[in-house]
C-alpha cells in the first residue's frame, strides 16, 4: 500500500512558529546590541528553566544571524553545565557545532529553513515517518520532497511569500484557496507530537520519570538539577521535552 505524506512543507515554506519571529529581525536590530546581550544573559541565568519565553529571550543576543536558530534548544549552556557538573572536563560546545551547521545565506529565514531541512527533517521527522510507515507495511511518499519542488522553494520563493510576522506558509495557503473548493475542510492539520506535558500530569508517568532519573546512584546527571526540572514541570513550566530526553538517554545508557 502506498500512502502520501506531508513531510517537508514546514521546512520548505516556513511553517514553524519561530519562523515568524525571524521576520522581526529588522525590529530587533533597532535594540542596541549591549541591551540584547544583557537581556539574553540575564534570562539564561535568572529565569527558571522552562519559563515561558526564556528560550526566545536567549535568542536576542549580539549576533541574531546565529543565535535565533538556537532558540529551540532544550539544554542551554548554563543548564548543561549544571546537569553535567561531575563532568567538567567535557567540552560542552553544542552552540558552536550548531552555528557551524547553519547554511550560509544573507536572508535569515532562508538560512533557518535550510538548516531545518538538512538537519531536523532528515535526522528526525523522516526517520520517524519511515519507521512508523514501514512497520505497518506502508510505502510512504512525500510529494513536497520532489526535487523540483525543493529547487522551486529554495531558489525562487522569497521569504515574504513564505512567512510574515502575522502568518506562516502563505504561498501554500494562497494555492489551496485557488485550487480547493470553498466547502473543502481547511482546518489546521493535527500534528503527531507526543503529548508529554499531558502525560506528566498523571502520577503514573511522573513517578516513572522520577524513578528513571532519580532512582539510581549511577546517573551522570546532577540529581538536584534533575529534581528542579521535575518540580518545575509540576509548577506548570515547560520541561517535558527536557525530561523526556534525559529519560531516553538513561534508558539507552542502561
Regions found by a protein language model. Give the residues of each.
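Active-site adenylate/phosphate-handling loop in enzymes that bind or generate adenylated species
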Residues: 1-50, 120, 126-149
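Adenosyl-5′-phosphate
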Residues: 2-4, 53-254
Amino acid at each position: 500500500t502506498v500512502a502520501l505524506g506531508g513531510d517537508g512543507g514546514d521546512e520548505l515554506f516556513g511553517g514553524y512558529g519561530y519562523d515568524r519571529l525571524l521576520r522581526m529581525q529588522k525590529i530587533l536590530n533597532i535594540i542596541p546590541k549591549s541591551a540584547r546581550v544583557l537581556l539574553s544573559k540575564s534570562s539564561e541565568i535568572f529565569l527558571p528553566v522552562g519559563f515561558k519565553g526564556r528560550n526566545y529571550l536567549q535568542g536576542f543576543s549580539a549576533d541574531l544571524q546565529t543565535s535565533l536558530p538556537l532558540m529551540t534548544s532544550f539544554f542551554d549552556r548554563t543548564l548543561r553545565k549544571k546537569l553535567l557538573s561531575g563532568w567538567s572536563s567535557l567540552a560542552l560546545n553544542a552552540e558552536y557545532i550548531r552555528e557551524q551547521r547553519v547554511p550560509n545565506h544573507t536572508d535569515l529565514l532562508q538560512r533557518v529553513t535550510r538548516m531545518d531541512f538538512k538537519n531536523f527533517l532528515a535526522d528526525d521527522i523522516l526517520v520517524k515517518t519511515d519507521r512508523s510507515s514501514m512497520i505497518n507495511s506502508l510505502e510512504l511518499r512525500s510529494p513536497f520532497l520532489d526535487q523540483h519542488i525543493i529547487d522551486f522553494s529554495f531558489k525562487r520563493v522569497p521569504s515574504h511569500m513564505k512567512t510574515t510576522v502575522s502568518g506562516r506558509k502563505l504561498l501554500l495557503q494562497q494555492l489551496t484557496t485557488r485550487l480547493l473548493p470553498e466547502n473543502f475542510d481547511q482546518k489546521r492539520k493535527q500534528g503527531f507530537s507526543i503529548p508529554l506535558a499531558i502525560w506528566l500530569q498523571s502520577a503514573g508517568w511522573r513517578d516513572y520519570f522520577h524513578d528513571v532519573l532519580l532512582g539510581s546512584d549511577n546517573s551522570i546527571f546532577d540529581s538536584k538539577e534533575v529534581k528542579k526540572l521535575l518540580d518545575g514541570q509540576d509548577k506548570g513550566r515547560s520541561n517535558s521535552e527536557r525530561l523526556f530526553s534525559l529519560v531516553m538517554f538513561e534508558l539507552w545508557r542502561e
